[in-house]
Amino acid sequence: MNNKPENILVCVAWPYVNGEPHLGHIAGNNLPADIFARFHRMIGNNVLMVSGSDQHGTPVTIRAKEENTTPKKIAEKYHKVWSDTFKELDFSFDLYTKTGTDNHKETVQNLFNSLNENGFLEEKYSEQPYSEKSEMFLSDRYIEGDCPHCPSRTKGDQCDDCGKDFEPIDLKNLISTIDNSEVTFKSTKHIYLKLPEFQEKLDEWIKSKTYWRSAVKNQSLGFLSNGLIDRAITRDIDWGVEVPVNGYENKRIYVWFEAVIGYLSASIEWSESKNNKIQKKDIWKDWWLNPDSKHFYFQGKDNIPFHTIILPAILIGSGNYNLPYDVVANEYLNFSGRQFSKSKNWAVWVSDFLKEYDSEALRYYLSSIMPESSDSDFTWESFFDSNNNELVATFGNLVNRIQSLIKNNFDNIVPETENLDDVDNKMLLDIKNSFESAGDFLEKRQFRNRLKEIMLSLIHISEPTRQAEIS
């Protein structure tokens, strides 16, 4: 570990606030990010952990229609739900904000203008999916059709199965997932980000990341091998950040373009807020412009290209901002063998869980089954086993025995260390080595291995304390 404190930026995926959080949201990116941030604070690094609610985009407007209210009211309602949930789980955000702030709007528009001034934006007319039944243009996630490159049924402009990009118009047998109607296409103008301009630089940069998880690196290089295409960064919607271009008053900036800029806007907001105890308003630059700083982005696997392709292109094209040091993308947490689904109501909602069980038990269990390299499964049986056989039987009993020894032999006062024999010294050395090993696992973002190392250490030292209690 370094002796000089490092500037560590911990960026946590911004959730759509169109519903309540379930356990899959927590295990996928929020919990590992919090563990990582706490670890780096403990070893003396300067940590800034930021995230916020993604209040824009079609999911929020659809939920507003379902509840017969406005997108703003939905966005604020569920922002509070998510924010309160994170507090209940004791997540240590330096700032959890939202995309509906003036600061975020200004930051997004500033980067948009920088990209435009640097020649990386272009206006084009294109045919975009449209629902005659709902009288609205459809975002990528609300169209479904047959992939033009493989037999899969897919959504949007990218196939999760074959990994290839395409235009929505290339999909066959298209339907709107909002109203199940046939999709038509209408000509409309949009502003595009010239991603091919960044192809060579991104390829070189990603290949240099020898420590990235293989799934992250391989998926990113797969996108590049298919050849990057220009991506529209505006949409025909009326909810979101306004486009700072004449003639685009009835359009908004594409939610995924502006959402990934949220990490920067949140850092700036924190820098100017009372939460910044240093009270240096431009201190955000210590994380974003200092090349020695390290950025860690905690995501689900479905968000990989947005943080290894889209965000780096934006940062390169708009200024001298630091690029991600690592994109820590987890697989999915399933529930009893099936993927969590809000629409199918197949989930364990965090609010329901916390009504019955302690948040620390949840944090421990999710850490032990964290889906780092493959999908993992939440079951109630394994949660109870984890709580009873590990937290209570191993950790809890060890703490109880040590407290009893101190109470019965030293009048509840922790004694000075003296008269250590070889067995004592070996146990202390084993504990030291075990926790150093656990720290190494955390440095490498291997959270399950870290927890296993700690629990093995506790099991190892439990026997001597048990014998001491007996004697």
Which stretches of residues belong to each language-model region?
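Structured secondary-structure scaffolds
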Residues: 2-51, 103-106, 172-408, 450-454
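Non-catalytic interaction-recognition regions
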Residues: 182, 421-425
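Single conserved hydrophobic/aromatic residue that forms the stacking wall/gate
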Residues: 459-471
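Structural signal for well-ordered, non-membrane alpha-helices
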Residues: 83-86, 112-116, 396, 403, ...
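N-terminal, positively charged nucleic-acid-binding surface of large information/translation enzymes
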Residues: 2-205
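Aromatic-residue-lined binding/catalytic grooves and analogous aromatic/hydrophobic interfacial grooves
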Residues: 447
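Long, amphipathic alpha-helical stalk/connector segments used for oligomerization, subunit docking
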Residues: 378-382, 387, 405, 409-416, ...
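A short small-residue
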Residues: 58-64, 91, 373-382, 435
